[in-house]
Amino acid sequence: MEITFVNPGADYMIQRMIENDLLAEINYDHIPNLKYIGDNYMKMTRQFDPENKYSVPYLWGTVGILYNTKLLDELGVPAPTKWADLWDERLSGEILMQDSVRDAFMVALKKDGFSANSTDETELQQAKQDLIDQKPLIQAYVIDQVRDKMIGGEAALGVIYSGEAIFTQRENPDLEYVIPKEGTNVWIDSWVIPKNAPNKENAEKFIDFMCRGDVALKNFEYITYSTPNDAARDLIEDEDLKNSKIAFPDLSQYSGLETYTYLGEDGDSLYNDMWKEVKSN
């Protein structure tokens, strides 16, 4: 099968692909609609694509806590403001955690005041123990299911991506989203082109098409994940959505925000081994 372009998802995967010489440099002369991508998002991508040679921002967002105000009121528990609130024993059986090694460890590392990209074994051991200690409180480790469970009122709170939070609020008005005060992961998904792509110029044409303001708007309205396209945001007619603090938070108002970076093979192995200990404990 011939692959012309890919959206590898996680920003740190792009860094890994760059380091392994798997990506083609993009000819930005073929992508005039790149001008609609906000400068701040191009700066964000430099954390994994330092010279902006290999990627074009597609979607972005944060990881935070989605909570059901009605259920929390019934439990007599205040709205969460920090990651440490996910260790509140009053919430036993009401917490949904992401079934993802990087996201789960990010929560614990941030709770403890450490970097989401830490490879310090002492810090990771502390985070691992925190996750083990949290397990009796967890209803389930989930990925996509967090959306449906929260919409259905099956849990009081869960760790979720901001784009999913926007969708859930459309379905259940009792749901609110917060970026914890300790900081979080700010992620950005980007388009890249494999080095051996047989139709690189067509791939660039497609990326340029996806950077058109009207196209980016339709994409955002359909999938509810935030667009880095300034022209698309200007075209949003729903004022509540256009000014949504979930979709378009003012990142300057938060501290401790980080994109994930590639940890190297040793770092990946360390995280994966510790995650297995958490899940099997």
State the predicted function of each range:
Residues M17-E25, P50-N52, F167-I179, L241-K245:
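Ligand-binding "clamshell"
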Residues L251-N281:
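Conserved C-terminal helix/tail region of periplasmic/extracytoplasmic solute-binding proteins
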Residues E2, N7-E154:
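Extracytoplasmic ligand-binding site segments that recognize negatively charged/polar headgroups
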Residues P194-S255:
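Mature extracytoplasmic/periplasmic domains
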Residues Y12-R16, I151, L157-D174:
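A ligand-binding cleft/hinge motif common to bilobed small-molecule-binding domains
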Residues L66-L71, K110-K111, W187-N199, M210, ...:
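A bilobed periplasmic-binding-protein/Venus flytrap-type ligand-binding module shared by bacterial periplasmic
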